[in-house]
Swiss-Prot record:
Complexes and interactors: Monomer.
GO molecular function list: 1,4-alpha-glucan branching enzyme activity; cation binding; hydrolase activity, hydrolyzing O-glycosyl compounds
Protein name, UniProt field: 1,4-alpha-glucan branching enzyme GlgB
Record function comment: Catalyzes the formation of the alpha-1,6-glucosidic linkages in glycogen by scission of a 1,4-alpha-linked oligosaccharide from growing alpha-1,4-glucan chains and the subsequent attachment of the oligosaccharide to the alpha-1,6 position.
Protein family per UniProt: Belongs to the glycosyl hydrolase 13 family. GlgB subfamily.
Recorded catalytic activity of this chain's protein: Transfers a segment of a (1->4)-alpha-D-glucan chain to a primary hydroxy group in a similar glucan chain
Pathway(s) where this gene product acts: Glycan biosynthesis; glycogen biosynthesis
Highest taxon in the source lineage: Bacteria
Length: 728
């Protein structure tokens, strides 16, 4: 029995309770020579090999039958490269000792990670295939400052936590280890003795791929190459650009009819992408594709922020989908969830036995609505983890924009909480100052690092300046979902037309605050679930009136200031609520031409016309781009307004939201001349009654609404028409 290593140390090492394996294992100089120590469970014989010659230079003595070996190589005073020849079950294997390598993380990286200012933490943390001293393998690192011991376990070591305990970098709380021979495609996790002595097995927070549920292991996977954003894609997100978003849940857009199974990323690239392009959309927005354990969360409770879900294929398959979208001229928006995470044991919850990623007080760290945990944005390493993730999706996958979910739940400490269920901030207020700073910092970094990529906020309150720069007190988002517009318009259109005159302001109110933010007008997935009915089914009246109301609503929406968003199925008027477990009702478009085809054709024409005419999109956020012509005709529920581009070209939009046709409806205009009907939601092409103005109408020198020139139109029942001026 050697007196060089204390028996208690050997016992602790074998039991997996020793926190500093590099102080014992590997090669160490002694007075008698260099000593090599190794923990190799189930080995029966171990030799030290000199790689240059292949010669055995020393045999290690088994000091403990559980696999602890040690031996001195005399006449050697300096550390040298070596390998171990290990006899396992009668077969000899030549291995490189993980404990023969020095520290992995550079001091500057460790400092930046500790400070929370490492722009790309995923380049350092996690699992990265690498070559060290000519040896190929994988370097692993994980932030777990309060753990007593952390090991890498995986397919390369029989999931045995004794075999690969990691080195702790105490200055940063990061554990690291290079494992020779570990390679891409192998499964792994981190096994740790936590701060309280409890054994935990965790997935890698920075894993680039993960197993599909219910399995939870991470996969060694190379860091994707950076994607260069083209100038065309940068311009596509501009405030003056036409932005029409098709919001999609990949798992239920379309499924295989024989087994109701999902389409793969590559199948979606071949089917969804050309469909969205044909429909005239400019952007596809994906509900979260980060790995998540529960299908019913739709991806909004992610456990693998850096890993595309395996439900639809591999990481490379997902990149194929994005590349296909870009090749088709479509930008890709990713729903991003930095607001909360699920409490699954294998994830971030109590990661090292402490509330590392979350707040310890449930009044700050627990989300009552969703049974999830809230990130501690005030902890530098946590904020860095999230900021790096935003940059990762844009730089490494070519994502063009991030839509941030549930911003209100992040920035208000009392969100969905009663009195006594929340903790005020340091000034006694309800704002989550750390979350606000996190969002501002994220948006600032993205603006600096990836100009052209943008962020969009789903923010349900009247927090000022969500899409204004921090210098103006804002959060720094480029766009904000206009949930007020969505609620007001849906409330209006669900009314029987006879009552709409009493709620005229529902449609006019939006212009009173339109210039306070850069708005997106959303008819999203949230509006077709949980008993709210489909958009079509909310419309009043019989089938004819329901479809007419919906068409008129869409005509109003696509002409109103703000970028556009439709959830899948809305474009062909699906009649039932969305179900994430099944395909959209594509059968509604089978057989003969019907009302659903009419709505689909209308949405396509709306998209194409909206994109073609600058007046409909160039000045969404400038008061010059909009003017009411008729705003107060509540008795007849008629609205008329003008959209205008920077050159002064106008489009007139006239809506009649009753089933009563309005012939000879006169209103004043700014520009006399011949006005051509470029869109009529009541056209027979869309299965309407085909009332209208024979394609065009000439203005009169007839004073109306305080203007010397006017138009006299036929306003079809339950319709919106668009007119463009052709000349004097």
């Amino acid at each position: 029995m050697s007196d060089r290593i204390d028996r208690d140390v050997i016992n602790a090492l074998i039991a997996g309770h020793f926190s500093d394996p590099f102080s014992v294992l590997g090669m160490h100089p002694t007075e008698a020579g260099v000593e090599v120590r190794a923990l190799l469970p189930d080995a029966t014989e171990v030799w030290v090999i000199e790689p240059k010659t292949g010669r055995k230079v020393g045999k290690l003595e088994c000091l403990d039958s559980r696999g602890f070996f040690s031996g001195v190589i005399p006449r050697r005073k300096n550390i040298f490269r070596y390998q171990l020849a290990v006899l396992w079950h009668g077969q000899e294997n030549l291995i490189d000792d993980p404990y023969s390598f020095g520290p992995l993380i550079q001091e500057m990286d460790a400092w930046l990670l500790s400070e929370g200012t490492h722009l790309r933490p995923y380049e350092t943390l996690g699992a990265h295939a690498d070559t060290m001293d000519g040896i190929t393998g994988t370097r692993f690192s994980v932030w777990a400052p309060n753990a007593q011991r952390v090991s890498v376990v995986g397919q390369f070591n029989y999931w045995d936590g004794r075999r690969h305990p990691m080195r702790l970098r105490r200055e940063s709380g990061i554990w690291e280890l290079f494992i020779p021979g570990a390679h891409n495609g192998q499964l792994y996790k981190f096994e740790m003795i936590d701060a309280h002595g409890k054994l935990r097995v965790k997935a890698d927070p920075y894993a680039f791929e993960a197993q599909m549920r219910p399995a939870t292991a991470s996969l060694i996977c190379g860091l994707p190459e950076k994607v260069v954003q083209s100038e065309e894609r940068k311009q596509a997100n501009n405030f003056d650009a036409p932005i029409s978003i098709y919001e999609v849940h990949l798992g239920s857009w379309r499924r295989h009819t024989d087994n109701n199974f999902w389409l793969s990323y590559r199948e979606l690239a071949d089917q969804l992408v050309p469909y969205a392009k044909w429909m005239g959309f400019t952007h596809i927005e994906l509900l979260p594709i980060n790995e998540h354990p529960f299908d019913g969360s739709w991806g909004y409770q992610p456990t693998g922020l850096y890993a595309p879900t395996r439900r639809f294929g591999t990481r490379d398959d997902f990149r194929y989908f994005i590349n296909a979208a870009h090749a088709a001229g479509l930008s890709v928006i990713l729903d991003w969830v930095p607001g909360h995470f699920p409490s699954d044991d294998f994830g971030l919850s109590e990661f090292d036995g402490t509330d590392l990623y979350e707040h310890s007080d449930p009044r700050e760290g627990y989300h009552q609505d969703w049974n999830t945990l809230i990130y501690n944005y005030g902890r530098r390493e946590v904020a860095n983890y999230l900021v790096g993730n935003a940059l990762y999706w844009i730089e490494r996958f070519g994502i063009d924009a991030l839509r941030v979910d549930a911003v209100a739940s992040m920035i208000y400490r009392d969100y969905s909480r009663k009195e006594g269920e929340w903790i005020p901030n340091e000034y006694g207020g309800r704002e989550n100052l750390e979350a606000i700073e996190f969002l501002r910092n994220t948006n600032r970094i993205l603006g600096e690092q990836v100009p052209g990529a943008v962020t969009m906020a789903e923010e349900s309150t009247d927090f000022p300046g969500v899409s204004r720069p921090p210098s103006m007190g804002g959060l720094g988002f480029w766009y904000k979902w206009n949930l007020g517009w969505m609620h007001d318009t849906l409330d209006y259109f669900k009314l029987d037309p006879v009552f709409r005159k009493y709620h005229h302001d529902k449609l006019t109110f939006g212009m009173l605050y339109n210039n306070t933010e850069n708005f997106v007008l959303p008819l999203s997935h949230d509006e077709v679930v949980h008993g709210k009915k489909s958009i079509l089914d909310r419309m009043p009246g019989d089938a004819w009136q329901k479809f007419a109301n919906l068409r008129a609503y869409y005509g109003w929406m696509f002409a109103f200031p703000g970028k556009k968003l439709l959830f899948m199925g809305n474009e062909f008027a699906q009649g039932r609520e969305w179900n994430h477990d099944s395909s959209l009702d594509w059968h509604l478009l089978e057989g003969g031409d019907n009302w659903h085809h009419g709505v689909q054709r209308l949405v396509r024409d709306l998209n194409l016309t909206y994109r073609h005419h600058k007046a409909l999109h160039e000045m969404d956020f400038d008061s010059y781009g909009f003017e009411w012509l008729v705003v107060d005709d509540h008795e007849r529920s008629v609205f008329v307004f003008v959209r205008r581009d920077s050159a002064g070209n106008e489009i007139i939009v006239a809506s009649n939201f009753t089933p009563v046709p309005r012939p000879h409806y006169r209103f004043g205009i700014n520009q006399p001349g011949k006005w051509r009907e470029i869109l009529n939601t009541d056209s027979s092409h869309y299965h309407g009654s085909n009332a209208g103005n024979a394609g065009a109408v000439q203005s009169d020198e007839h004073e109306s609404h305080g203007r010397p020139h006017s138009l006299s139109l036929t306003l079809p029942p339950l319709s919106t028409i668009w007119l463009v001026r052709e000349g004097e």
